[in-house]
Amino acid sequence: MKDYLRNSIRALLLVLAVLLSLPAFSKAVEIEGINYELEATSHKAKVVAKRHGQYAREIAIPETIEHNAVTYRVTAIGNGAFSGCTELVSVVIPNTVTNIEGWAFYYCTSLSSVAIPNSVKCIEEETFRGCSALRTIDIPDSVTTIGRGAFMNCEGLLSVVIPNCVTTISHNAFYGCTALSSVALGCAAKEIGTQAFAHCPRLKDVFCHAASAPKANSQTFDKNASRSTSLHVPGASVENYKATMPWSTFASITSLPAEDSEHQDM
């Protein structure tokens, strides 16, 4: 009985310690048309969804905001913050933002312009899923991981350049990007998940700058698409790709243009 009480007290103390260590966010406040959660101790702010209605047209997120005579630094865009905002056209994100949480721009079907700052390290799960008006996306060099379904069903996306620091492209990352014709993978690419580029029927060229063929599987690309898609890799790595599935199934495997290889090695 004593052991039971002792263990129960320890468990309660542990829970209390965890709760006390969590950021103390206040209720959402609205400042100049944008809703935020404010963290009292660190003076950080997170953009969150509107309580009523949707964000529309152009949104410019500031680096800092003022509330009750206190300055807060905007460091995050919260889970689902702009989800389903079908009239949102463009978003400017400041360099103070280090975290864009999952589903942040989920099915923002009119979103055609968004600049991801160099402070962001990961594009989270389904962040831009269903943003069908996006034609291009500039992924900054700071990003190392592209999460599951991050750009899934971005049906207007024409091309994508994955920067050199990205090591992992997760499952379904670009699934259903039906207009996608060109993909450039950086030299740090290590692993590409299942169906990452599936249902991309217009994919014609894949430029992969990794010296060794990244880990992938038979479902990473469409089987039919790979038969009509050209793969371009470093000259010294052509045989490595030809001997590695699923890369060996591509219609042709050729050396990257010299100037393209030099650019990626910089």
What is each residue range found by the language model?
Residues G33-N35, A40, Q54-A76, T86-N99, ...:
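Structural signature of tandem-repeat unit edges
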Residues T220-N224, S237, T244-A251:
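Acidic, glycine/polar-enriched metal-coordinating patches/loops
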Residues M1-L13:
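Bacterial N-terminal signal peptides that target proteins for export
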Residues D260-M266:
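C-terminal cell-surface addressing/anchoring modules of secreted/extracellular proteins
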Residues A11-S21:
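Bacterial N-terminal signal peptides
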Residues T194-Q195, A216-K223, K242:
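Short, T/G/N/S-enriched strand-turn elements that build extracellular solenoid repeat scaffolds
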Residues A24-E30:
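Boundary at the C-terminal end of the N-terminal hydrophobic targeting segment
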